[in-house]
Amino acid sequence: MRSQLSLIGKKEGMMHVFDKNGNLVACSVISIEPNVVAQLKTASSDGYNAVQMGADAVKAPEKTIEKRFSKALLGHFKKSGGCAFRVLKEVVVSEEAVQSVSLGDEFGVEIFDGVSNVDVCGISKGKGFQGVMKKFGFRGGPKSHGSGFHRHAGSIGMRSTPGRCFPGSKRPSHMGCDRVTVKNLEVVKVDLDRKVMLVKGAIPGFKGSVVVVKRSCGVEG
């Protein structure tokens, strides 16, 4: 049932590799340290079946850890072995998958060895407050002399009837920092010694950001 698990990794950047045909392929590098099962949820006790994974263990004295985390989290960590984690992620799985794992079990990048495609979820790069031309690709207004709305959105409504702007129109707003999932990325290589995997193409987030990797359920059409 390892195929249903999602692992927490870190985006290390991008690089180029040559495939077997000699083509240059742009790849994203994801490092995946061993993930620990921090909690098991069942339909009888929680209403659904899920596995909570913990990653990026905190290496600090016990007194320092007690100051950084609440008592509720410290008690939660003790149930899975006492190690405190910076990142906790939960994945919904089947009842058989919950029964096949135990608290404290470790899973690493080896579960993706032999997998052809994966889905990667992360937080996209923040771009700040942006206008409609950058965020939505609007054409903008005339660029000639005398024009007063070069980068404006244009008309956003009527006059006295209805006397308001309809909600849902595209306006200047904050861009980025969204939860994004890129599906069906090809796995180029899994390096068990370095605990990294290479996937073809780009993944969301900046260098060093946390991503969640899982096996693809199917090909996106």
UniProtKB/Swiss-Prot annotation:
One Gene Ontology term from the biological process aspect of the record: translation
GO terms for cellular component: cytosolic large ribosomal subunit
Pfam families in UniProt: Ribosomal_L3
The keyword RNA-binding is annotated on this UniProt entry: yes
Molecular functions per Gene Ontology: rRNA binding; structural constituent of ribosome
Entry superkingdom: Bacteria
UniProtKB keywords: Ribonucleoprotein, Ribosomal protein, RNA-binding, rRNA-binding
Record text on subunit structure and interactions: Part of the 50S ribosomal subunit. Forms a cluster with proteins L14 and L19.
Record family assignment: Belongs to the universal ribosomal protein uL3 family.
UniProt xrefs under PANTHER family: 50S RIBOSOMAL PROTEIN L3 (PTHR11229), LARGE RIBOSOMAL SUBUNIT PROTEIN UL3C (PTHR11229:SF16)
Function: One of the primary rRNA binding proteins, it binds directly near the 3'-end of the 23S rRNA, where it nucleates assembly of the 50S subunit.
The name this protein goes by in its record: Large ribosomal subunit protein uL3
Annotated gene: rplC
